[in-house]
């Protein structure tokens, strides 16, 4: 009983192998792969040969159990898919193959001709002569190139030497110009220093001169101030002295007049009014506003001359009165001699 199911299972494996071999999808697969697949499924060599023989004959013998009782068909075992059929070759494939073959053949021919044949067969004399001529020609070409290169180098060196000489001359000229410029700058600096010293000396001298002139002018102004005070005082005293003389009766005046007065009975007193005489404050303020220069000195001299003219315009009787010429002015003259140069009168300050 146990042997019968085993035989049936082996027969089923053989029949399935026959069906596998008869399948059209793997008909083009190689036989070795088919045998290898069947061996992987557990079939022996005898069973594989039997399955191959049955596949060739195209008959499948059913087992006795299959003839009597048809069991359910077992599942088809897994197997590898067969390779796809080779594509048909056309003219393109043949053309590519021919081109590749021709290229390979030409490469082999050239390799053999250039590297193999010269080592096997010695070169001919003509070839040696041609190689020698080619080498000589190359040597001549290289020699001509070297000569040309040497000539170019010499010309280049000559140009560089000329340029270097010109540059040296230019640099020398620049150095000379720089030296001359430095000397001129030094001379200019020394001249400027000398001028500065001269200017400082002139400035100092001018300041000293101005100071001395200022002191001189101050002294002269002081003297002028004193003279103005004296003149104003004299004018004031002369006015006081004339009033009593004019008020005396004719008999007394004629009896008291001197012979000089009798000779000049009518005297024109050209006395300027007091308003025409500038005050001291005006004189000082004007002098302070003006700078001490040549114009101010000229104005000062002119003003002094004007004052002298004013002093000269004082009549003789006033001068004689100041010296005690008449009896009416003797007392006033005595007072004037007792109190000389009292200062600026009050009426002048008020003016």
Curated annotation (Swiss-Prot):
Residues 54-75, 243-351 are annotated as: Disordered. A motif (SH3-binding) lies at residues 83-91. Keywords: Membrane, Peroxisome, Protein transport, Translocation, Transport. Residues 60-70, 320-334 have a biased composition (Low complexity). Belongs to the peroxin-14 family. Disruption phenotype: Cells show an absence of normal peroxisomes. It is found in: Peroxisome membrane. Pfam families: Pex14_N. This is Peroxisomal membrane protein PEX14. It comes from the Eukaryota. Residues 245-258, 294-303 have a biased composition (Polar residues). It is a peripheral membrane protein. GO terms for molecular function: signaling receptor binding. Its main location: membrane. Residues 283-293 have a biased composition (Basic and acidic residues). One of its GO terms (biological process) is protein import into peroxisome matrix, docking. GO terms for cellular component: peroxisomal importomer complex; peroxisomal membrane. Disulfide bonds: none annotated. InterPro entries: PEX14, Pex14_N, WH-like_DNA-bd_sf. Component of the PEX13-PEX14 docking complex, a translocon channel that specifically mediates the import of peroxisomal cargo proteins bound to PEX5 receptor. The PEX13-PEX14 docking complex forms a large import pore which can be opened to a diameter of about 9 nm. Mechanistically, PEX5 receptor along with cargo proteins associates with the PEX14 subunit of the PEX13-PEX14 docking complex in the cytosol, leading to the insertion of the receptor into the organelle membrane with the concomitant translocation of the cargo into the peroxisome matrix. Interacts with PEX13 (via SH3 domain); forming the PEX13-PEX14 docking complex. Interacts with PEX5 (via WxxxF/Y motifs). PANTHER family: PEROXISOMAL MEMBRANE PROTEIN PEX14. The keyword Cell inner membrane does not apply. The lineage of its organism: Eukaryota, Fungi, Dikarya, Ascomycota, Saccharomycotina.
């Amino acid at each position: 009983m146990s042997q019968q199911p085993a035989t049936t299972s082996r027969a089923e494996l053989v029949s399935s192998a026959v069906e596998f071999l008869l399948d059209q999808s793997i008909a083009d697969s190689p036989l070795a792969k088919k045998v290898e697949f069947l061996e992987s499924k557990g079939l022996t060599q005898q069973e594989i040969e039997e399955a191959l023989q049955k596949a060739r004959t195209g008959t499948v013998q059913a087992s006795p159990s299959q003839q009597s009782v048809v069991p359910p068909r077992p599942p088809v075992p897994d197997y590898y898919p067969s390779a796809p059929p080779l594509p048909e070759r056309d003219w393109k494939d043949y053309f590519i193959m021919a081109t590749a073959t021709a290229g390979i053949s030409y490469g082999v021919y050239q390799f053999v001709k250039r590297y193999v044949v010269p080592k096997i067969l010695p070169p001919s004399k003509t070839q040696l002569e041609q190689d020698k001529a080619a080498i000589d020609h190359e040597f001549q070409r290289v020699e001509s190139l070297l000569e040309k290169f040497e000539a170019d180098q010499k010309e280049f060196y000559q140009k560089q030497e000329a340029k270097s000489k010109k540059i040296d001359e230019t640099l020398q000229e620049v150095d000379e110009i720089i030296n001359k410029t430095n000397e001129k700058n030094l001379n200019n600096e020394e001249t400027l220093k000398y001028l500065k010293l001269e200017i400082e000396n002139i400035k100092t001298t001018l300041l000293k001169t101005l100071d001395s002139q200022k002191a001189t002018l101050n002294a002269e102004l002081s003297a002028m101030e004193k003279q103005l005070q004296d003149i104003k005082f004299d004018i004031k005293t002369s006015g006081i002295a004339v009033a009593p003389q004019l008020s005396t009766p004719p008999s007394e005046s004629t009896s008291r007049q001197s012979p000089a007065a009798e000779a000049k009975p009518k005297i024109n007193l050209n006395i300027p009014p007091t308003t025409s005489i500038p005050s001291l404050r005006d004189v000082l303020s004007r002098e302070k506003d003006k700078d001490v220069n040549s114009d101010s000195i000229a104005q000062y001299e002119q003003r002094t001359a004007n004052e002298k003219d004013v002093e000269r315009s004082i009549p003789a009787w006033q001068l004689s009165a100041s010296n005690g010429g008449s009896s009416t002015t003797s007392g006033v003259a005595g007072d004037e001699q007792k109190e000389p140069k009292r200062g600026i009168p009050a009426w002048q300050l008020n003016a």
